[in-house]
């Protein structure tokens, strides 16, 4: 596992965007051989999406031959709702870059057959071989995507019941009214994430410090689903300074020394 220790959320967003752009450009995608990118929603990736849009407008990257798969979507929320992840992604990213509509894959939380929707999503991912880079965030309780604590580390795309804590955290997007937050969501599984060639998780804020500690210094544990990344051959945690407050000093020093060259120029 790599840990990229930065200072601010803006630096995290810029580093993550730069890494994505470097991966896409090194891959040299074509229509027949697209780069497959997994994407999250929420507050954490906002600085990354902003930086990606800026880099696209500056001519540093094209998304014409990039295929995307989003992590999750609420169940029962109309896709036109401003807080659906369909709306979020178009508002904050897709509408500002040159990605073709047919290359965008989002779970349908209003599908008449939820189980079939989840199976088809997994099948479509497999049809591309694999996701080359899956970007994500982490919840205060260590969940990735909507894989809440005690999720199977072998799980695939499915419907999940959201914990009260997750709904409270997400209520900030729903006028701070937890009753407006859907109780269920479709989400890729932990196993789906682990199948990706590379997984990059961004960690922001002191409220995520225990989750980061569990991911880096703890044991692999389904109560902290983020800890599954210890099993991944190419996992990256990109974090700001407040999120590292629970890490041991020697742990942080170790990763600062390892990544000194990779965090320059931000």
From Swiss-Prot:
Q: Which domain of life is it from?
A: Bacteria
Question: Can you name a GO cellular component term?
Answer: cytosol
Q: One Pfam family of this protein, by short name?
A: Glucosamine_iso
Question: GO molecular function: any one?
Answer: identical protein binding
Source gene? Answer: nagB
Q: Which residues cross the membrane?
A: none
| Residues with site note (Part of the allosteric site) | 151, 158, 160-161, 254
The GO annotation for biological process reads:
carbohydrate metabolic process; glucosamine catabolic process; N-acetylglucosamine catabolic process; N-acetylneuraminate catabolic process
Give the enzyme class: hydrolase
Q: Which HAMAP family match?
A: GlcN6P_deamin
Keywords associated with the record: Allosteric enzyme, Carbohydrate metabolism, Disulfide bond, Hydrolase
Q: Give the multimer and partner information.
A: Homohexamer; trimer of disulfide-linked dimers.
Q: Which reaction does it catalyse?
A: alpha-D-glucosamine 6-phosphate + H2O = beta-D-fructose 6-phosphate + NH4(+)
Quote the catalytic residue positions. 72 (proton acceptor), 141 (for ring-opening step), 143 (proton acceptor), 148 (for ring-opening step)
InterPro entries registered for this protein in UniProt: Glc/Gal-6P_isomerase, Glucosamine6P_isomerase, Glucosamine6P_isomerase_CS, NagB/RpiA_transferase-like
Homology family: Belongs to the glucosamine/galactosamine-6-phosphate isomerase family. NagB subfamily.
Q: Which organism is it from?
A: Shigella flexneri
Outline what the protein does: Catalyzes the reversible isomerization-deamination of glucosamine 6-phosphate (GlcN6P) to form fructose 6-phosphate (Fru6P) and ammonium ion.
Q: How is its activity regulated?
A: Allosterically activated by N-acetylglucosamine 6-phosphate (GlcNAc6P).
Its protein name is: Glucosamine-6-phosphate deaminase
Tell me the pathway: Amino-sugar metabolism; N-acetylneuraminate degradation; D-fructose 6-phosphate from N-acetylneuraminate: step 5/5
The EC number on file is 3.5.99.6
């Amino acid at each position: 596992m790599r840990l990229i220790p930065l200072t601010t959320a803006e630096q995290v967003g810029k580093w993550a965007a730069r890494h994505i752009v470097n991966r896409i450009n090194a891959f040299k995608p074509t229509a027949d051989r697209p780069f497959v990118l997994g994407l999250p929603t929420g507050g954490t990736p906002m600085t990354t999406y902003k930086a990606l849009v800026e880099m696209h407008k500056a001519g540093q990257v094209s998304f014409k031959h990039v295929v995307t798969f989003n992590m999750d979507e609420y169940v029962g929320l109309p896709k036109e709702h401003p807080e659906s992840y369909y709306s979020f992604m178009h508002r904050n990213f897709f509408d500002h870059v040159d990605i073709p509509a047919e290359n965008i894959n989002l779970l349908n939380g209003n599908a008449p057959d939820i189980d079939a929707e989840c199976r088809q999503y997994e099948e479509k991912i497999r049809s591309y071989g694999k996701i080359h880079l899956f970007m994500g965030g982490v919840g205060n309780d260590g969940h990735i995507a909507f894989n809440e604590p005690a999720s199977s580390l072998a799980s695939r795309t499915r419907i999940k019941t959201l914990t009260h804590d997750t709904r409270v955290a997400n209520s900030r997007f729903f006028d701070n009214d937890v009753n407006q937050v859907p109780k269920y969501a479709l989400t890729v599984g932990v196993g789906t994430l682990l199948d990706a060639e590379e997984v990059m998780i961004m960690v922001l804020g002191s409220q995520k410090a225990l989750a980061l500690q569990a991911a880096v210094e703890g044991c692999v544990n389904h109560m902290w689903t983020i800890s599954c990344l210890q099993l991944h051959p190419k996992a990256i945690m990109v974090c700001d300074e407040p999120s590292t407050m629970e890490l041991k000093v020697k742990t942080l020093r170790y990763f600062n020394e390892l990544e000194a060259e990779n965090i320059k120029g931000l």
